[in-house]
Amino acid sequence: MTLQWYTNAAMETPRRAPNAARSFTVRELGHVSLFVRDLDATRRFYRDVLGLAETGTAKDGRIVFFSAGVHHHDVSCELARAPGPGPQPKGVPGLYHIAFDVGVSLDDLARARRAVEAAGLPPYGQTPTSLCVRDPDGHEIELYVDVR
């Protein structure tokens, strides 16, 4: 089964680009690292709202690691040393969003929606299989279901 996404293009099982000259292979995305303004607010969002496990800290507690369960960490958040400009407007170079797979059914997505709404986070940018919220620093977080 293919899934129609934002465009008319179907989402097929990905295939690696052929490249005989490549001397290594990227197996998967390892983690995302973010600078944040408030580690307590960040913990509440990633741990308490999204349900990621807090797996450790580094640099005297200035970095917190969160895991979805397979790796030591999928997200690391480091306390910023200076205030930042906030989220980038859409369409300019920079991080657009981070997406988390929350299940395989629309019921799974509905549970995610109820959880973020209960935390006072208004979902936006919904598609039939996803929704978005902002973390405490304004990073766009997409929650989606993979309904292939």
What are these regions (language model features)?
Residues 1-23, 28-37, 86-148:
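Vicinal oxygen chelate
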Residues 18-21, 82-89:
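Short beta-strand/turn micro-motifs at beta-sheet edges
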Residues 23, 35-80:
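Core segments of cupin and vicinal oxygen chelate
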Residues 71, 103-105, 148:
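Short coil/turn motifs at secondary-structure junctions
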Residues 80-82, 146:
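Acetyl-CoA-dependent GNAT
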